[in-house]
Amino acid sequence: MSLRFIVGRAGSGKSHSCLEEVRQRLRQNQGESSIILLVPEQATFQYEYMLATTPELKGMIWAQVLSFRRLAFRVLQEMGGAARAHIDDLGKKMVLRRILEQRKSELKVFHRAAKQPGFADSLASALSELKLYRIEPQELQKGIQHMQEAPGSAIRDKLADLSLLYNDLEEFLSGRFTDPDDYLNLLAQRLPGSRTVQGAEIFIDGFTGFTPQEYGVIEQMLGTADRVHVALCFDPMYLQEPCDELEFFYPTVETYHTLLDMAGALRISLEPPIICGKETPVRFQKDSAIAHLEKYYFRHPLQASDAAQGVSLVACANRRAEVEAAAREIIRLCREEELSWRDIVVVLRDLTNYSDLINTIFNDHGIPVFIDEKRNVLHHPLVELIRSALEVITQHWAYDPVFRYLKTDLIPVQRDDVDRLENYVLAHGIRGNRWNDNRDWTYRRQYTLGEDCDIDDNEAEQLAQLNVVRYAAIEHINNFSKKVANCGNVRQITTALFELLESLSVAERMEAWAKEAEVAGRLIEAKEHAQIWDNVILLLDEIVEAMGEQELNLEEYLQVLEAGLESLKLGLIPPGLDQVVVGTLERSRNPNVKAALVLGISDGVLPARPVEEGLFSDYEREALREIGLNLAPGARRKLFDEQYLIYTALTRASSRLWLSYPQADDEGKALMPSPVIQRVKELLPLIQEEILPVEPPCLGGDLAFIANPSRSLSYLAAMLRETVAGRLVDPVWQDVYSWFVQQPQYQESCRRVLAGLYHVNQETSLPPSMGRRLYGSRLRASVSRLERFTTCPFSHFLSHGLKLKERSQFKLAAPDLGQFFHAALKLFAERIKALSLDWGQLSRGQIITITGEIVEELAPQLQNEILLSTARHRYLIKKLRRTLERAVVTLAEHARRGSFRPVAVEIGFGDNAELPAVQLDLADHCQMEMAGRIDRIDSACEGGQHYYSLIDYKSGQPDIKLADIVHGLKLQLLTYLDVALRYSKQLTQQEALPAAMLYFSVRDPFVASTGPMTEEEAEKNLLKQLKMKGLLLADPLVISKMDKELSGQSDLLPVGLKKNGDFYSNSRVITEEQFKLLRNYLEFKLKSIGQQMVSGDIAISPYQRGKEKACRYCIFKSVCQFDPLLEDNLFRLLADQEEQVLWSLIKESLGDKHE
């Protein structure tokens, strides 16, 4: 039995020496003894690979590459102890939650923290640390006794709490479970009797230091194995000289002395150490720059070198540019220096901000990559299935969990069917027991409250298919819901969950997905699918083992399960042999690489800022160390350990070292380089730092950007854009373009790039024949449709030509409220007519009663009872009642002060309507039929002549200007007035003249006041706020029929009358001749718009008038992609002109017709 050290600085050949000796033993070994190569967990694959690929080595059956944990499994399988169920971190946390609940009243320090979420996690970590450092509850009690002289000591009370909880945990685990944190203690106990270790030769490599548990195992090895070889990285000078705590080699020198003392205590013979390396370590014989960094980085005073080759310093615009640059460098190394992918590693201090970027960008560059990190599985379909299935029940079949469940692709329903089902559910607000009440869905979207509810054959067939999909979609989750309803404890719920997974054949689906991914070459994804099922089942088993008989409701069970799923991570080994490995400095173990790219060398990242973690502060750790309770190093020691990580980063590769840092983060905030960068500059002053942008510069471009065809193509597109813009571009991009054009596989991509360069974001007109096919030679149109066309022809094409529309959702929107008020006001007019009541004589009480009845009648009809669906919507009914009441009170005041009375309410014109359609002849034998519905037509008689006042209800605060009519933006009022006058004989048996066209705002406004206000004053203020807007006939007698109390400015109408009978200048009045002129212009404008439609005008041409833009509320922005910065995307500017100019334009447009 002997111990031998293999010592040397980085790159001196320690690992090579270990491997060579193992190979030599394998060549000589005839089975007399086993050979164990003990390395860190993450390095086992690399060492196995290096042994397995040794030329002329016939086999390695007598050699095993193991980590401490794998050695423990091997020995416990041999000696007993491996069969007992083990409990992992999640199980311990669940047990500790229960213990904390039971003991919270007895805790001195943790009694408040015990209730906080996450405390069980911190406690579990603290107890694991105690076990790793071989501190038993008895040692904690001794520590408490040492501190008895310090009354009220927080550390003493903390130890007391930990001792109590530690004891409870051990009592719970005893005889039931094996704690993985105890594996190495068990290994140390069983190891002396193990034939695996007895007489074996053990090589230990790759460690900086060991935990007390690991020291305990090594202690037993020294007394059991034949020979133990330990490779440690430090300068051989420290074999004879003391090492200061501030030295970066201190951790490994401390390890050396600990093992030396251990061997002395055990009286194990020491073999002479093997000292590796010469003046220049073997690894760096070919690269003096890296060798200089290895030797002098931590030495003072500074010793600069004129060496430069082999080390690169790179500053990049941001992290994306940094990873892009790293990808280009890797391709260059493989292409120009003939390295293999496996010869290159990428290392970082922290992968958090880089992992996704590296995965995406390296794949874009065609670089095979393996990122050495535990993979979170929260977004895996299986995990999402489990979480959403439970949430479906806990959230009572809410929309979100139901469709997360259905979109996992683990349900026997096609995704297209799920999408159709989702559209239907969103449109009709289906949730809760409407999913599983066994009644077919027959809900339909109604666009008016009086719509016929009969379902045609096509709709019936679609609903039948939808219900088939629905029943198939909920079959398994419905059964699961019924089972869970009868479950009383954790075991029963978990059993029901497992049966759900079985019924869905999830295990078979995972296997099929794994095979599919493997065939497609997605090896990482294949391994994830292959591992996830077993890991989830193990998690369910552990939950049952730890809490099986505990009674939890489903919400509490879900919390426990989610905690387990969040901690579930997959550890994968590299799926291929030749690939770039990416890892952190702490985990990365690649002993034989030629090039290392160290990314993210920013201030505060490398070295990392120390952070106090766990239940013990640095001060408390030091205090415990003084009484013999040694815990893990605190933040201060970790800061010194960071120096060793810097050393490993700089010495990882043998020939190429590429150091980079980002100058800004993802939000553009500046980042400073690490002091490491400055130190390297000082040691190697001849190295020129490169500053790399996100994209290549136009002139003097770096050829490294032309490294990968797919990425070069995107850069080429940028360069061609610069050329088109008239800027000079490096001629090399012409060569790049020529290369792409000559490659058959890239010709289509080149075509798209060129098309994009000269892309004009504009649509050419449809051929007239296509326009007629699309809209018909007999164009049926509404005024709102024509106004949409005037707003933007392309918007009209999308909505009425292609019939695009927003996804229908079960929510109360402005159109729904408009629909409600139109129906309510119609019903009110019909109700008072049936009761023979006059609008002008209605009392407030009558108004309140009738409006209340109407709201109660209509509320259930709106959108499948949406107003009854939630408390918020039920409150809205009260608001709607108030608004309707206010509208009727205002209209009644109009009637009281005037003579105009309704002659038609909600009257339609068009096919199958009360009034005929308006027929307009267009060119090329086309016709346009105008159809619509008029809210209200009032009539009064003056001097034997009937006059019509046209009223349109709006929910906002609308107004109309002459410019709106001239530009065709607001034609509805004028069109409806024209229809009313056109068919006046059918309404009042004689022709009528226009009196007004007005907007009436249906709303319940607030009254602003700076002081007390009487009810009469408030009513007057409300009338002013609800004053109608529009145009009236400039005839005082006719206007007096609308407001007989008019004196000065009217509070009902947009008009004011002076004492001399003249109108105020702000009065919105026009003459009878002007009304006639507007009606003639209307016909001209309608025909003009209709002709543009059928002619195929679909131009992207939104209007802009001042700050008002057509695109502001357009739902088609993502389709048209209108961009004012593009040369061909210009707003159609509409100028604000004086009314005199506008009347001239109208006359000019009509020519002789206005005479």
Swiss-Prot record:
Q: Where does [4Fe-4S] cluster bind?
A: C792, C1111, C1114, C1120
Q: Which UniProt keywords apply?
A: 4Fe-4S, ATP-binding, DNA damage, DNA repair, DNA-binding, Exonuclease, Helicase, Hydrolase, Iron, Iron-sulfur, Metal-binding, Nuclease, Nucleotide-binding
Which branch of life, at top level? Bacteria
Q: Which Enzyme Commission numbers does its entry carry?
A: 3.1.-.-
Q: Which GO terms describe its biological process?
A: double-strand break repair via homologous recombination
Question: InterPro entries per the record?
Answer: ADDB_N, DNA_helicase_suAddB, DNA_helicase_UvrD-like_C, P-loop_NTPase, PDDEXK-like_dom_sf, PDDEXK_AddAB-type
Determine if DNA repair is one of this entry's keywords.
yes
Q: Which GO terms describe its molecular function?
A: 4 iron, 4 sulfur cluster binding; 5'-3' exonuclease activity; ATP binding; double-stranded DNA binding; helicase activity; metal ion binding
Q: Report the cofactor remark.
A: Binds 1 [4Fe-4S] cluster.
Q: Which cofactor does it need?
A: Mg(2+); [4Fe-4S] cluster
Residues at which ATP binds: G8, R9, A10, G11, S12, G13, K14, S15
Where does the UvrD-like helicase C-terminal domain start and stop, copy by copy?
A: 280-590
Task: Work out whether the entry's keyword set contains Lyase.
Answer: no
Summarizing the function annotation, the protein's role is: The heterodimer acts as both an ATP-dependent DNA helicase and an ATP-dependent, dual-direction single-stranded exonuclease. Recognizes the chi site generating a DNA molecule suitable for the initiation of homologous recombination. The AddB subunit has 5' -> 3' nuclease activity but not helicase activity.
Query: PANTHER family in the record, alphabetically?
Result: RECBCD ENZYME SUBUNIT RECC
- Assembly and oligomerization: Heterodimer of AddA and AddB.
Which family does this protein fall into?
A: Belongs to the helicase family. AddB/RexB type 1 subfamily.
What further fact does the record state?
A: Despite having conserved helicase domains, this subunit does not have helicase activity.
Quote the protein name from its UniProt record: ATP-dependent helicase/deoxyribonuclease subunit B
From which source organism is this entry? Desulforamulus reducens (strain ATCC BAA-1160 / DSM 100696 / MI-1)
